[in-house]
């Protein structure tokens, strides 16, 4: 990919630098960077006794003006995506929202990888969910899976937001609500941002309740597509704000959303 600028003749002109950006599932802007993120296999040095690799965040930083492209160092265990929420599951990030020099991102639980499924003798597999562990490789494209994985989350009635101190994503605070399911729209391998700030500094976190599409009831959310809020000046969910989108739309949900102006959003 490459970037463009408007020249003196008011024409779009390509910059000289061209970049082979690695695979990503979400993206956003922070300070001078266009950032991308995905979750993938970590270094072989971190393999467990079975040879299974942990999932880690794979980040890219494109500085358009300087025409530089860098990535994170996955030797740093701070980028570990495994057991990110304390329930054994790995996560992927959906959205990169810059707010007061921090990054807000939805942490979307993805289930147990081979690495997570075997950890501590399978301690993270909930009782009664043993049959959800895959017994062979299968699926295709973004829904492919490997033997030993427990694909998709066991906790569909939770929404987590990670608040990172800066673009390195190495230090964070996690906040949780059980009013909505995880906050992202999804199309194949892309996890769409559904967390946006209003002009007054409030942050609105939308969930389309994608987990309603899960085939197994144990992994299917019972929560409506809805929205919650993080009030300006706080880093917690507002306990007094919840809005069911389905209740106001005849049971309909949405795929994506964007901030327009003020506290208006387009879905």
What is each of the regions a protein language model found here?
Residues 1-84:
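Post-signal peptide N-terminal segment of secreted/secretory-pathway proteins
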Residues 2-3, 51-68, 119-170, 218-235:
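Beta-propeller blade signature
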Residues 3-19, 72-91, 168-190, 233-255:
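Surface-exposed loop and turn segments in beta-propeller and other repeat-based domains
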Residues 9-18, 199-203, 207-267:
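Hydrophilic extracytoplasmic domains
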Residues 19-35, 40-41, 86-100, 187-203, ...:
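Structural signature of eukaryotic scaffold interfaces centered on beta-propeller domains
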Residues 39-53, 89-90, 110-114, 210-214:
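Short glycine/acidic-enriched loop and turn motifs that connect beta-strands
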Residues 154-162, 168-230:
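Loop-centered beta-sheet repeat module
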């Amino acid at each position: 990919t490459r970037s463009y600028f408007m020249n003196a003749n008011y024409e779009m002109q390509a910059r000289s630098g061209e970049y082979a950006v690695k695979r990503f599932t979400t993206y956003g802007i922070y300070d001078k960077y266009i950032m991308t993120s995905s979750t993938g296999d970590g270094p072989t040095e971190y393999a467990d006794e079975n040879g299974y690799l942990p999932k880690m965040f794979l980040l890219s930083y494109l500085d358009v003006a300087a025409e530089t492209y860098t990535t994170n160092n996955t030797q740093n265990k701070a980028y570990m995506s495994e057991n990110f929420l304390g329930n054994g599951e790995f996560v992927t990030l959906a959205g990169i929202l810059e707010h007061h020099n921090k990054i807000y991102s939805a942490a979307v639980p993805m289930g147990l990888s081979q690495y997570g499924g075997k950890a501590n003798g399978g301690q993270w597999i909930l009782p009664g969910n043993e049959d959800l562990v895959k017994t062979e490789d299968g699926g295709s494209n973004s829904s492919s899976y490997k033997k030993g994985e427990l694909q998709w989350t066991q906790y569909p009635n939770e929404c987590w937001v990670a608040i990172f101190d800066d673009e390195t994503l190495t230090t964070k605070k996690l906040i949780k609500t059980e009013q909505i399911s995880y906050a992202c729209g999804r199309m194949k391998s892309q996890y769409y941002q559904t967390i946006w700030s209003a002009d007054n500094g409030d942050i609105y976190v939308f969930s389309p309740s994608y987990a309603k599409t899960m085939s197994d009831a144990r992994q299917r959310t019972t929560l409506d597509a809805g929205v919650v809020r993080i009030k300006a000046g706080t880093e917690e969910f507002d306990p007094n704000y919840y809005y069911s989108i389905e209740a106001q739309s005849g049971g309909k949900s949405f795929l994506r959303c964007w901030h327009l102006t003020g506290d208006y959003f387009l879905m």
